[in-house]
């Protein structure tokens, strides 16, 4: 890092501080101000926040690493702007008119208090033990590699970077609430995009262009069926990404994440009205088309450079692991460290900071909101709005502490836990997705049906995760049908079958129990909206919204056709 890099980082920090100070000075009189930014966010802030919140360590390390190790396969999860459009066009009207703060609260409106509690517990545990922990852990690794510092003042630089990232982000999240998340995203998103674009351009320049990347990666097979790194659709016998499983599994996980998860939907709930919320999702969908090119393809570039350097008799581009293989997870930080000139490296570091801080801030705020609204306020409904804000700030502090305490565990088993993260999402998503999908699309879905769908998903998911831990450490143990279903079955196929099972549970239990009253589900399910509510929704979009939606869908289709 040169002096010019530090100057660029300093300017970024000053701009960030300026925004945070302005946000903190704004009055936050009630919980809606603190957790939802006063429900007056515009489409630019919503779309930028959706994108910036989504881009975290799983992209800077995981997605680029996936590009370097397996090529295009993970693009199924990243070319999902179409799923954000479903959030905007299908779910925004129901979420907006319900005036809820959280997704568990919406399930209580649609089903019962037990459903709210189940989803709140699942969400809080998964946020603290997976999303917060992995973002912090990976953030420390990224900065250790980018700065090239092993120790500082006798302390492992990993700890300085990880703890510093958490504390700085926590400070502005605690005092600024949702507004700090939204408005810092407006600054952070363009910096992240610009920094990543520079890496893409310089990477292609060093390698020799797109054709050279496709030539090198297209010559590398990734399975016994002969599929190469450049192929998105792979044999159904592929052990990791069978094409049918990838299409079904990525859709289920994407639906859960983009349309029902508090972490994302909270940005839409902060919208001024349906129009701003929907346009925010359209803007976010445009931005979501970019990660494949900004993170996954740079990972493929890093792999191609590694192969090219080795072919020329050099030592390779990527650092090597102890087992003699290239460290794919180091792809993105290695590109930053080796290719970028002074000043530009500082800008890209700002982009990395922006991604990690925005993602962490969103996690802190969403977790605090879940605790405050779904637990504290439920048991103390007469709590004043100002006290709820204080409780939210205190909850954020607790979540920060839990995240910090989890870092040593993450570091000791980081590689193993990171490998299981996709497995965690694949078993977390089906039950929740089934409860929301049928709850909004089918009037006959009963409170007991939705609740038992959630319970079935939770029990099956925990069984799968427990089996993964047991059998992976037990050696070659015979397990019969149980072992095949809960350990050996491809995680994407398991996700699909689990979703189908949860759908069946919801339907069967609903038909066996009392149907919900019209008053209970009015405005929350298709076919129950009043003429006034339908007119409000119709007035919230025009032909330009449709045109942009069609453009996004067209780009998505073209991508699949090109990499088929």
Question: What is each stretch, according to the model?
Answer:
Residues 1-564:
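Membrane-embedded helix-loop-helix hairpins and adjacent transmembrane boundary segments
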